[in-house]
Amino acid sequence: MTYSVHFEVNLEAIPEGARHEIRRTVQQIADVVSTIPGSSPFWSSMKESLLQVDVQGWRLVYRVLPDRREIRVIELEALRR
């Protein structure tokens, strides 16, 4: 079962191309996380971890919530150029 993606940030102010790429990237993360076995040591490190990824000039901070099978994007900021 694939992880669902939830954005706790407003993506509307982001240009359409970057917004599309952000959604696509986070969905890819959700798809990959769904393939990790429940017995993997990866999950014990995810309990309190914040992760980040940079996409087209934007930094996203997210959590993996295995009990809910969710990826939650909790922060978004423009990177300085």
Residue ranges and their predicted role:
Residues M1-V5, E16-H20, R24, L50-R81:
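Enriched for short, Lys/Arg-rich terminal
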Residues L11, P15, V26, A30:
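Short amphipathic alpha-helical/adjacent loop interface patches that line ligand
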Residues Q28-D54:
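A short, surface-exposed loop/turn module that caps and links secondary-structure elements
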